[in-house]
Every structure is written in C-alpha cells, then in structure tokens.
C-alpha cells in the first residue's frame, strides 16, 4: 500500500508511506516526511522524519482495528513561529523568539483503525504516544544569528498522529 498523511499535507510537509504484509495479521509500515520550506519573515518549520512501524491487525490486515509499535528519528530547524501554545510539557511559545536546530530519536506505541472506501482505497486514522530524545542548538531570532546555547530534552507525549489516504495494490 502507498499512503499520504493528510495532516502533514496541511502543514506543507511532503510525505509518503509504504506498507506491506508480513504475515496473516502483521504488516510493516514505513513513512517519511520532509519539509524544506522557509516562509516569509524567516519563519521556519524545516524538518525530516523517518518512522518505521510494525502493526498487528485484530481482524485482517489493512482493515479494522490495529495496534502498533514504532520508532522515529529525524532533524529539525524551527523558528520565528508565533502563536504556538504550551503543549504536553513543551513550551512552543519560545519558537517565536528563537530558532532551534537539532536531531531526535524515539519510540512509541499506537492504535488505529482503517475504513475501506473501495477496492483499492482506505482511510486510516492513528494516534501514537511515546518518548523522544532531542539534542539541539538554540539561536536568537528573528534573523537567527547568534548561538545562545546547546541543550537536550526528553519529550513524552504524542509521537504519531495520522489521517492517511491509502491506496492498496
């Protein structure tokens, strides 16, 4: 199957997923996301992410309920983003005055459901929670010049949120 996460599409993030059957109720999903764009006023939401995932389907593969275990890793360059809230222990409001550049790696578990739309089309929803370690450099904004410092952080919370449009071969 090939898939696209409509939530990533809404954030201008290019994404593509591939899923293949491993056994009667098991599949392997691999998704990749990339956002190379810089917007006006030096606003950045640049990142890439790779997320491999094993899924166990309770009825049959590619239909109904599934449970998942996933890994995630990537790099980011975020900054000059106004109006973001505090979310799950992360103070996203700091992205208004600073730029963060770093990498992350983590793991999580998820639950999802796939609705059959037709012979070759599914709509799939999934939510995942877990943890991710990140190491980053913090820069001044809005011109993002001077290095303020380096730090690391362990994030606990959402590690996957997807509404996928799926094409089945």
Task: Name each model-derived stretch.
Residues 4, 18, 30-32, 52, ...:
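Membrane-embedded beta-strand positions of outer-membrane beta-barrel proteins
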Residues 22-24, 52-60, 112-117, 167-169:
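Outer-membrane beta-barrel proteins
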Residues 3-17, 35-46, 61:
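Solvent-exposed loop/turn segments connecting transmembrane beta-strands
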Residues 155-169:
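Outer-membrane beta-barrel "beta-signal"
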Residues 25-28, 62, 120-123:
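Repeated loop/turn-to-beta-strand initiation elements of outer-membrane beta-barrel proteins
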Residues 6-10, 32-38, 56-58, 71-77, ...:
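Transmembrane beta-strands of outer-membrane beta-barrel pores
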């Amino acid at each position: 199957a090939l898939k696209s996460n409509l939530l990533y599409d809404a954030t201008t993030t290019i994404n593509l997923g591939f899923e293949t059957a491993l056994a009667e109720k098991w599949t392997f999903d691999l998704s990749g996301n990339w956002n190379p764009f810089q917007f006006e006023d030096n606003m950045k939401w640049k990142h890439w992410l790779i997320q491999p995932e094993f899924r166990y389907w309770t009825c049959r593969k590619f239909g109904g309920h599934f449970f998942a275990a996933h890994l995630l890793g990537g790099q980011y360059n975020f900054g000059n983003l106004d109006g973001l809230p505090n979310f799950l222990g992360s103070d996203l409001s700091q992205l208004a005055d600073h730029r963060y550049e770093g990498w992350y790696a983590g793991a999580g578990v998820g639950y999802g459901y796939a609705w059959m739309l037709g012979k070759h089309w599914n709509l799939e929803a999934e939510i995942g929670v877990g943890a991710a370690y990140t190491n980053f450099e913090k820069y001044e904004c809005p011109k993002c010049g001077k290095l303020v410092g380096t730090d690391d952080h362990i994030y606990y919370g959402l590690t996957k949120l997807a509404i996928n449009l799926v094409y089945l071969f």
